[in-house]
Amino acid sequence: MADDSALYEKYPLLNLLHTPPHRPPPLQCPPAPRKTACRRRLGSEHVDRPLTTPCVWPTSDPWTVQSTTSSLTITTSTKEGTTVTVQLRL
């Protein structure tokens, strides 16, 4: 077996058979933020109730913005006359 060292010198990749691969240390993940206490919503809170005075913002652009307690609606028209409405439910 004295020829083994000569064999490893001639074929250095043979060292990989007996050498464990280098493993980098595991990454340390930052701890998760603490969960804040929250209260449970009532069933009546899920209804889309309009505000006592609906909010409509006049703008210089041809945009209409309306909001309720749980949604925001933006409406505009293109130059071609197509009406575009985007509604975001909160």
From Swiss-Prot:
Keyword presence, Hydrolase: no
Top-level taxon of the source organism: Viruses
Principal location class: host cell
Record GO cellular component, one term: host cell cytoplasm
Any matching Pfam family: Pap_E4
Annotated compartments: Host cytoplasm; Host nucleus
Post-translational modification: Phosphorylated by host ERK. The phosphorylation triggers a structural change that enhances keratin binding and protein stability.
Keywords noted in UniProt: Early protein, Host cytoplasm, Host G2/M cell cycle arrest by virus, Host nucleus, Host-virus interaction, Modulation of host cell cycle by virus, Phosphoprotein
Signal sequence residues: none
GO biological process terms on file: symbiont-mediated arrest of host cell cycle during G2/M transition
Record function comment: Contributes to multiple aspects of the viral life cycle including viral genome amplification, suppression of suprabasal cell differentiation and egress of newly formed virions. Induces host cell cycle arrest at the G2 phase by associating with and preventing the nuclear entry of host CDK1/cyclin B1 complexes. Inhibits cellular DNA replication by preventing loading of host replication licensing proteins MCM2 and MCM7 onto chromatin. Within the cytoplasm, associates with host kinase SRPK1, a splicing factor regulator, and inhibits its activity.
Additional remark text: The major E4 form is first synthesized as an E1^E4 fusion protein from spliced E1^E4 transcripts, such that the first few amino acids of the E4 protein are derived from the N terminus of E1.
Subunit structure: Assembles into oligomeric complexes. Interacts with host CDK1. Interacts with host SRPK1; this interaction may favor expression of late viral transcripts. Interacts with host cytokeratin components KRT8 and KRT18.
Family of this protein: Belongs to the papillomaviridae E4 protein family.
Protein name (database record): Protein E4
